[in-house]
């Protein structure tokens, strides 16, 4: 019995000895395959960066050509009215078409990482918009701007969301659940009046109108992002009611703004009480850290980093900026603007790249009804709120001057209201949010619905630019 067991043990040992090289070879092959995959991934990422940087360089140089042509002879003056974003998108479409024709391998280089957008691209855009505000005009019209940005965004979201849901239910548009429709309403409510503001600047329009449109767009982006992310949580927590979402939206916005203000005031205090002005490099580096800190801190606290960095930028431009040395002031202003410009250009370029390279699902009923609902939601936003603001202003002037309210002109004229109605263009924020939704692992939303939302948002942005 012992010999048989011993022979069996030797046989098993022999088999293991023969199997050991096989397992070792399999491990080496697997490791080699893993290293090859890693090398291929690194190569793809490198070519992706080369493509992005080259396209950014071409877009920036074309922007320079536009600015140069706009300053020369009357024959080229029309170039001043051509938005830079439109040119960037067109260049992106051209590059995407070349990639598509070149083959599947090259077209796969075009990738979108939502984390890259929310962590690297969006924060500098939002911060710079707050940091570069003309504070006197902004705070002088703050009440009206808040009404249009907060209440107006909510109204637009509700009108577009419920409209898309109802039209889909009766078969006119693409069928969406109420939550899907409201998410679409929230992301499509993010405005981008870059083209309108460029024309405003060229025509030298009224400063109040300019600030209303610009101020609304600054706050609207942050409000739309917070509202979008609040609604996205419903896919994971379906038991919550929409009233709870509204309360969460208000609380998140409020506390996020508080975080941004606290960090900004702390930065102003540090810069004032120290002698960092003797070391401009250290001073500038610390300013950049304080600029980014509200976003990270708010996200760590499960708040809105976008809202925090917006209010941080506004307060830092009012206090921290004037505690910097003169070289650091110039450096910070120019660098913040440069980073925001690069981020905006990258987003618009990717919008153009996406048109020929992404897989699209067109639903003409949803696209056409979406455009109508956007204009309708914008109308329900602008005209009733402008009438309420004008009425309030008349009452205030009447109490102050003791004059008849009919003797006072409306604060926002009907002509200006129509301009504001059509200035709410869909922008890069809307497109980036819908791509984030597509990349999100949501089992409650079908891939077809995600594709329809991406295609519709892209077409609406292209058409209404």
What kind of feature is each model-predicted range?
Residues 2, 12-465:
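Transmembrane helical cores of multi-pass secondary ion antiporters/exchangers
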């Amino acid at each position: 019995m012992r010999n048989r067991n011993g022979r069996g043990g030797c046989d098993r040992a022999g088999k293991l000895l023969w199997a050991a090289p096989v397992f070792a070879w399999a491990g080496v092959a697997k490791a080699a395959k893993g290293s090859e995959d890693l090398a291929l991934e690194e190569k793809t990422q490198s070519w992706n960066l080369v493509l992005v940087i080259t396209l950014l360089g071409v877009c920036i140089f074309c922007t320079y050509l536009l600015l140069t042509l706009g300053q020369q002879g009357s024959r080229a003056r029309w170039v001043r009215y051509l938005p830079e974003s439109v040119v960037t998108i067109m260049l992106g479409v051209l590059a995407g078409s070349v990639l598509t024709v070149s083959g599947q391998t090259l077209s796969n280089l075009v990738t979108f990482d939502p984390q890259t957008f929310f962590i690297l691209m969006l924060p500098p855009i939002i911060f710079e918009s707050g940091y570069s505000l003309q504070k006197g005009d902004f705070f002088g019209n703050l009440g009206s701007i808040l009404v249009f940005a907060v209440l107006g965004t909510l109204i637009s979201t509700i009108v577009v969301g419920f409209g898309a849901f109802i039209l889909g239910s009766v078969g006119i548009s693409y069928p969406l659940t109420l939550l899907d429709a409201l998410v679409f309403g929230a992301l499509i409510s993010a405005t981008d009046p870059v083209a309108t503001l460029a024309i405003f600047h060229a025509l030298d329009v009224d400063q109040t109108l300019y600030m209303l449109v610009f101020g609304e767009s600054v706050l609207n982006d942050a409000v739309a992002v917070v509202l979008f992310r609040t609604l996205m949580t419903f896919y994971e927590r379906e038991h919550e009611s929409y009233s709870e979402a509204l309360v969460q939206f208000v609380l998140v916005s409020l506390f996020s703004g508080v975080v941004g203000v606290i960090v900004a005031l702390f930065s102003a205090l540090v810069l004032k009480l120290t002698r960092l002005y003797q070391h401009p490099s250290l001073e500038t580096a610390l300013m950049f850290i304080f600029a980014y800190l509200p976003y990270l801190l708010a996200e760590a606290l499960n708040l809105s980093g976008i809202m925090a960095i917006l209010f941080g930028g506004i307060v830092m431009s009012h206090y921290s900026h004037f505690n910097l040395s003169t070289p650091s002031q110039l450096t910070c202003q120019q660098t913040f603007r440069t980073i925001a410009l690069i981020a905006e250009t990258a987003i618009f370029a990717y919008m153009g790249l996406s048109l020929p390279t992404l897989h699209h699902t067109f639903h003409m009923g949803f696209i056409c009804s979406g455009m109508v609902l956007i204009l309708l939601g914008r109308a329900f936003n602008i005209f009733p709120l402008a009438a309420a603001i004008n009425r309030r202003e008349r009452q205030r002037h009447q109490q102050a001057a003791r004059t008849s309210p009919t003797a006072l002109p409306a604060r926002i004229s009907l002509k200006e209201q129509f301009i504001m109605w059509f200035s709410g263009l869909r922008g890069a924020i809307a497109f980036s949010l819908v791509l984030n939704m597509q990349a999100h692992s949501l089992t409650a939303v079908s891939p077809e619905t995600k594709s329809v939302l991406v295609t519709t948002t892209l077409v609406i942005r292209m058409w209404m630019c």
